């Protein structure tokens, strides 16, 4: 007996008005993730995934392109307001926030969540080049 054709249902995107942009700016790369208030990821992009390799990956321009791509990925959710959480000392901190602002999001507040040890692990030895 022939099986009935299976129709794929189109997933309905939930509408989210407020989101949280998590920016992880390391010395080597910048990762931008936009989540809803509960922390469920809606979209993400990286400088390396945006076509930058090697030392170009750790530039402010690469971080800006990653932020633009992430903003484009979450446009369909209807996010208007963004809360920004910045982590890390990388060169892409400022340019990522500027790119998100230019993408049409209203940035409500910016928080630095860089982990600072209370004299935790011993740091690695100094580089000798």
Curated annotation (Swiss-Prot):
Gene3D superfamilies with a match to the protein in the record: Ribosomal protein S11
Signal peptide stretch: none
One example GO MF annotation: structural constituent of ribosome
Protein's UniProt keywords contain Iron: no
One GO CC term on file: ribosome
Keywords linked to the UniProt accession: Ribonucleoprotein, Ribosomal protein, RNA-binding, rRNA-binding
Keyword Ribonucleoprotein: yes
GO biological process: translation
One Pfam family named in its UniProt record: Ribosomal_S11
Subunit structure: Part of the 30S ribosomal subunit. Interacts with proteins S7 and S18. Binds to IF-3.
Cited function: Located on the platform of the 30S subunit, it bridges several disparate RNA helices of the 16S rRNA. Forms part of the Shine-Dalgarno cleft in the 70S ribosome.
Family: Belongs to the universal ribosomal protein uS11 family.
HAMAP family, alphabetized: Ribosomal_uS11
Listed name of the protein: Small ribosomal subunit protein uS11
